[in-house]
Design a protein with these regions (language model features):
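Short coil-to-helix segment of the ABC ATPase nucleotide-binding domain corresponding to the Q-loop/switch region
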Residues: 4-11
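Conserved ABC ATPase "signature" region
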Residues: 11, 15, 22-39
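Conserved signature/switch motifs of ABC ATPase nucleotide-binding domains
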Residues: 43-46, 64
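Hydrophobic anchor residue at the start of the ABC signature
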Residues: 58
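Catalytic Walker B motif of ABC-type/P-loop ATPase nucleotide-binding domains
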Residues: 69-72
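Helix N-cap at the start of a conserved alpha-helix in ABC-type nucleotide-binding domains
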Residues: 80-82
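ABC ATPase "signature
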Residues: 129-130
Length: 242
């Protein structure tokens, strides 16, 4: 409500349910402190930034002590810095209040930073669900369809394997060197990236393995319980026809 102050905006749900002025004042001031807007109590929405407006909306949603806080594309219109600050706030609220937070988003960085569990919806139905770590490690088809396959120039010979594993210390980063040493085989790394998941990091790499060593490599990965999948090579002509 553009004409009302931040205080009045947050107080509205409690006013509708006929809470006393004392109860409203106590609750609103507690929430203003929680979302970091105590100094904006008397400001009007037109004088707030996008991130501050989201903080007001979060505070207002918490006035009635809900069991679940639904955030529907809460960061979609915000810049990366503000997005991070809002996610930090939501994580802080989750820890302090113990409230369940459901985040609806198309931004995968939001899922990786703030969520413990995730489900992927396709045509109104749950296609896959699980912990965020498991979903991004296993890379189910629903996730790949959502993200769009990253184009990598893949060799047409041998086997192109995408490998995903957690990289939280120097030992984890030695996977490929140790695998090459253990198997006596040097393989090219075609692509690689590190993604952050709250306080953890996951590496996603693509390697090329010849036919002779394919079985040994995959057995090695399975024994180490490292997730892998073989990438399909699609000719550019076939892509154009599709």
């Amino acid at each position: 409500m553009e004409r009302e102050t931040v205080y009045q905006n947050i107080a509205l749900p409690m006013q509708c349910w006929k809470y006393s002025k004392e109860e409203i004042d106590k609750k609103v001031k507690e929430l203003l402190e929680l979302v970091g807007l105590t100094d904006k109590m008397n400001a009007k929405p037109r004088n707030l930034s996008g991130g501050q407006k989201q903080r007001v909306a979060i505070a207002r949603a918490l006035t009635m002590d809900p069991q679940i806080l639904l955030c529907d594309e809460a960061t979609s219109a915000l810049d990366p810095k503000t997005t991070n600050s809002i996610l930090d706030l939501l994580m802080e609220i989750n820890q302090k209040i113990g409230i369940t937070i459901v985040i609806v988003t198309h931004q995968m960085e939001v899922v990786r930073k703030a969520c413990n569990k995730a489900c992927i919806l396709e045509h109104g139905k749950i296609a896959d669900e699980g912990t965020v770590k498991d979903i991004f490690i296993k890379q189910p088809k629903s996730l790949r369809r959502l993200l769009g396959e990253e184009k990598v120039n893949l060799p047409k010979t041998g086997h192109n394997l995408q490998i995903a594993h957690m990289v939280n210390d120097l030992h984890d980063g030695e996977l490929f060197g140790k695998m090459s040493s253990d198997l006596g085989y040097v393989f090219p790394i075609l692509n690689g990236k590190i993604q952050e998941y709250q306080n953890e990091s996951m590496g996603i790499f693509v390697i090329n393995v010849d036919n002779e060593h394919f079985e040994k490599i995959t057995e090695y990965l399975d024994k180490k319980q490292i997730n892998w999948r073989e990438l399909e090579v699609v000719d550019e002509e076939e892509e154009e026809e599709e």
